[in-house]
Amino acid sequence: MSNSIIKVKKSGFYQDKTKLNLAGSHTWNTVQSIAGKKVSLDALTGNFTRLWTIETKGFVLGNKFYGSNLSGLAKVNVVPWKKDGRLNKQFYSQFEKVVKRAEKRDIVVGVCLFDNAWISYMDRGWEFHPFNGLGPSDPSEVHSKGPWNTFQRAHVKKMVKTLEPYNNVIFEVGNELHRNSVSSFQKNVVKWVKKFTDKPIGVSYASRVKPSAGRTQSWIAKTNADWAAPAGGERIPGFKGHYVFDTDHASALRTNVAGLQAANRRGDSLWLMDGLGGDILKNASNLAPDRAYINSIL
């Protein structure tokens, strides 16, 4: 990889003044193992992947979404915090190893700092979250203003400082954070990242904050984020950064080549949510055409 950090213009991501056509697939367990299973970078498609931070130590999938090969309680091997809110050093060491391997393969990684989906959508997810008992009354409060933000800021600082030596890194505030996050939390995380590093930071769709749910995504324009991945590829009035089309927020686990093609014509970066073999969650349809399309534009 280059010795220069990645920068963002409205037209895309750049490194050494050269535009990077970032397109690739991502899945949940590339950093953390879930039920003892971890996915190798070699199983993914393209020159980019999104690295998830799952916050809970366990959950039950059952028949969620399109099914899973897992049954019973699925345990996550390591998360950012211990039960008392202190940082778990093993998590950051494990994360860094994956980023380093990606760098050797010329893969850019989008580091997703927080997540709401696994504590809000999955059975028993909140039960095993480190903050359960440390302040928030339920998942809807985890990514909102509260004393526990001290633990979250420490996590952001540790992640940014750990990954500062690597120039294949961009950051993302969080995956489908609760709508309570859009008033202050997401803006604050953007501020924290910008204080600690010059690497880009983006925001993405907040859970059920989209036009089809009767809510506007205009909050995105107020975050000072460098890039954004709104639901469905929507254009946000007043947002001046680069757009990403992440199928996780448009057609998650379903084939959508037409959507990828349209986003590519708009100049968006293309990120594909892929359940692969279904060890965690199954794809609803065959994503081979979507993977092939991504490979065809690189």
Q: PLM features: residue spans?
A:
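Catalytic-core region of carbohydrate-active enzymes that cleave or remodel glycosidic bonds
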Residues: P200, S218-I297
